[in-house]
A protein has these predicted regions:
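Interaction-mediating elements
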Residues: 1-113
Length: 113
């Protein structure tokens, strides 16, 4: 039931997509969610602006989960996501926004949980 959507400014070749998928798959456990239900959407070549300036390297990340968001877990998740983006893509943490969304209604396979 978790979903991670990442929009980045640069091109993401297949090998980088695979690395990100693997790292996000491990990281989702911080939120108490299983990788077996994780959906990931990687969107590259986006125009992102911060403080009125276009970012050469930047990212916007949305983390969506079934249920409520634990503040402590989201703090740890933000740190981990920024670490992954810095390591794999060279995106500094001050060029990353992360938002969290929790919902009581999540559909899958023809019904809601």
């Amino acid at each position: 039931m978790p979903m991670i959507e990442v929009k980045v400014t640069m091109d993401l070749p297949a090998e980088k997509r695979d690395l990100l998928k693997a790292e996000f798959g491990k990281a989702i456990s911080i939120m108490g969610k299983p990788e077996s239900y994780l959906m990931i959407n990687l969107v590259d070549k986006q125009d992102l602006y911060f403080g009125g300036k276009k970012l050469d390297k930047g990212a916007y990340v949305e983390v969506k989960v079934l249920g409520s968001i634990d503040g402590g877990a989201s703090d740890k998740m933000t740190a981990k996501l920024c670490e992954i983006l810095e390591k794999e893509l060279g995106i500094p943490g001050n060029a990353v926004y992360v938002s969290y969304w929790g919902t009581a209604n999540w559909g899958w396979n023809g019904s809601n949980f």
